[in-house]
Amino acid sequence: MEKFEVGKIYSYKKGSGCGYDECISYNYYLITRKTEKSIWWKKISVSVEVYGKAVNEKADFKKFEKAVEKRSKIGIYEDEEYFIDTPEFGSQNYIFFKYTKEVK
């Protein structure tokens, strides 16, 4: 929980299960609030139609990061706010907490 700060954007690398590197994408989250046992976020809307191709490890991340920053400044987030509880080993929550990193 300590690594998450309210107001910062974090990314989480997510595979689509197709078995190719090109299918690995990044989800972006704005942390909106947090409690002792949970964090709340809004997901930044990122679509292949906007960027022309799926975001993957081989993509120009700096260029994409600027696009995310621009969109985040004008507030393009999904309306719904999500939360995740304290991680437990072996759960999806554990994976989220282990691999989510701040966008710098």
Segments predicted by a language model, with ranges:
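Short coil-to-beta transition motif at edge beta-strands of beta-rich domains
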Residues: M1-G19
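Short, solvent-exposed coil/turn segments at beta-strand boundaries
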Residues: F4-V6, R33-E36, Y77-E80
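Short, cysteine-centered beta-strand-loop-beta hairpins and adjacent loop/turn segments enriched
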Residues: G17-C23, V48-V55
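Short, solvent-exposed secondary-structure boundary/capping segments
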Residues: K37-V46
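Intrinsically disordered, low-complexity, charged/polar segments
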Residues: E49-K104
